[in-house]
Amino acid sequence: MKLRIGVIGTGAIGKEHINRITNKLAGGEIVAVTDVNQEAAQQVVTDYSLNAKVYPDDDSLIAAENVDAVLVTSWGPAHESSVLKAIKANKFVFCEKPLATTAEGCMRIVNEEVKAGKRLVQVGFMRRYDSGYVQLKEAIDNRVIGEPLMIHCAHRNPVVGDNYTTDMAVVDTLVHEIDALHWLINDDYESVQVIYPKKSKNALPHLRDPQIVIIETKGGVVINAEIYVNCKYGYDIQCEIVGEDGIVKLPEPSSISLRKDGKFSTDILMDWQRRFVDAYDVEIQDFIDSIQQKGEVSGPTAWDGYIAAVTTDACVKAQESGQKEPVALQEKPEFYQTFTTVKK
């Protein structure tokens, strides 16, 4: 029997998930959609030949008896409300980041899930499902390089739009590193600091680009994360972990190598969609499989979403103050202590 899924938000990422569930993955079926633009929602049903009902709002979709699970792919500020409604209805919910736009909102979701007493919420941090990151995690967990000491990473985009602001470098871009690195080394963050190197000529007048974020963990690991969103040459994700006994590095995406005209070259991807398309597939398949096989989700938790929110808030404060800022987490609920979200 297929997992019956309702989608809240039929924009770009919503359409991608609808397409992969309908045409690529196993075990799931889209039975309901809703969007603030009802015509757009109806068009998605037509375009993908869905046997799905268009609902006027998230309340009615979540309440539908034939909806087992919900995907929240709407506008970020609307996420918290939809997720809370899904939990209260005892529906499984996959929420694209951000889980909520504030740390307080994330904590409200955490508290509601704890009250439910069941893992219902999965947050869309897809890098945990990328094969390269999985290999890094396995190397670290198996102590291949001993204890991690330092991490060097970079998040580079060829270009960003005119509406991209300085704080978005953290809130929209670095947030993926914030989650992935915390997961990789299983160590909470202690403090953050933001440094602005010389500004790139490619950056718009209102944007500080590039930026370097220095993160210190409670265990003493120091992370330096470069964010450069107008690098021009491609979409480039780097991660190198320096341990006591060696170094492990994120592998480059698979690509042919070309020897021609006295040159040796490989391609660099130009967008995030191609770079992490497989991770998105594995992520949603895991959401479906975990519910069907275990009766609960097993991916990134609401608590992980809370950690990301608190850390990005601290980074934004550090952008403004120029000082080292603390990452002040509340005590982790016992409910989340026993869950592991490593993709095997």
From Swiss-Prot:
Its EC number is 1.1.1.18, 1.1.1.369. Pathway: Polyol metabolism; myo-inositol degradation into acetyl-CoA; acetyl-CoA from myo-inositol: step 1/7. One of its GO terms (molecular function) is inositol 2-dehydrogenase (NAD+) activity. The keyword NAD applies. Involved in the oxidation of myo-inositol (MI) and D-chiro-inositol (DCI) to 2-keto-myo-inositol (2KMI or 2-inosose) and 1-keto-D-chiro-inositol (1KDCI), respectively. PANTHER family: INOSITOL 2-DEHYDROGENASE (PTHR43593:SF1), PTHR43593. Belongs to the Gfo/Idh/MocA family. This is Inositol 2-dehydrogenase/D-chiro-inositol 3-dehydrogenase.
